[in-house]
């Protein structure tokens, strides 16, 4: 093969890789500037669900900030997503972190609803987003969205509770020397847990259990107007569970 052909082939391969990465960026939805809203009604009660993404443009998050501020001023109370630990010590948290990593392999849940670190890097390096001049950032803290913590409700389940419940049903997550020796911020190359258990944790705990919990809190809440800030992938499961508890809940838009 002549040098000119080799160079041409190399250019084509680079172009294809760039196209693939750019398509990946578009498919994640991180380039959308407009946030969606789902509105539910049950008599005098109103729920607005804003599906959150863990990566997005600054414009996208600015829009959510304005929506949250406006809706709170209209009397809506925020119910937000957060699986933050509720533990007594850093030692406990370290063990839970290693068990969580054993189960998910550095993932924070299902790949389609929470981006992997690898996806984040690919998105940030993608030619498409650089060309458009859009700055993709990670989801800011809720304080950025002007959430009123005096009234807001953490409508999620702590990560340690999810792990405890999983172990109660499926047995202890056994950590090996490799799990302790590998830093939490390093690539994970230890012996993985069985794929069937990973899938059960994702489906039954990361998804179903949290959706059931959110629906239960909303159904029993005294607030008449609720604004939910929760992951995009959880809306259908939340709605299904909410309507199972009370069929009078209807989706307006």
Located regions from the model:
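Structured, acidic catalytic/metal-binding patches in enzyme active sites
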Residues: 21-205, 216, 220-223, 251-253
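C-terminal motif of bacterial Sec signal peptides marking the signal peptidase cleavage site
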Residues: 15-18
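A cross-kingdom marker for long, charged
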Residues: 204, 208, 219-253
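A generic structural micro-environment signature
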Residues: 7-9, 61
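Bacterial N-terminal signal peptides that target proteins for export
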Residues: 1-7
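Extracytoplasmic/secreted proteins, especially bacterial periplasmic and envelope-associated proteins
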Residues: 63-66, 213, 233, 237
């Amino acid at each position: 093969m002549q040098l000119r052909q080799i160079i041409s082939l190399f250019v084509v391969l680079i172009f294809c890789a760039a196209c693939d990465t750019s398509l990946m960026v578009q498919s994640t939805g991180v380039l959308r500037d407009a946030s969606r809203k789902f509105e539910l009604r049950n008599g005098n009660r109103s729920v607005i669900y804003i599906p959150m993404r863990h990566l997005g443009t600054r414009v996208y998050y600015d829009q959510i900030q304005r929506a949250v501020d406006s809706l709170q001023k209209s009397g809506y109370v925020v119910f937000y997503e957060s699986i933050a630990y509720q533990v007594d010590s850093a030692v406990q948290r370290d063990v839970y972190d290693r068990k969580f990593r054993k189960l998910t392999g550095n993932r924070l849940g299902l790949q389609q609803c929470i981006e992997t670190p690898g996806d984040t890097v690919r998105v940030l390096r993608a030619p498409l987003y650089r060309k458009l001049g859009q700055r993709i950032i990670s989801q800011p803290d809720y304080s950025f969205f002007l959430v009123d913590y005096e009234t807001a409700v953490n409508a999620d389940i702590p990560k340690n509770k999810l792990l405890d419940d999983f172990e109660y049903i499926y047995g202890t997550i056994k950590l090996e020397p490799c799990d302790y020796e590998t830093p939490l911020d390093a690539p994970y190359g230890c012996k993985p847990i069985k794929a069937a258990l990973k899938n059960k944790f994702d489906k039954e705990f990361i998804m179903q259990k949290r959706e059931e919990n959110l629906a239960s809190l909303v159904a029993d809440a005294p607030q008449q107007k609720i604004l939910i800030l929760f992951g995009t992938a959880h809306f259908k499961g939340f709605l299904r569970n909410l309507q199972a508890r009370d069929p009078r809940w209807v989706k307006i838009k």
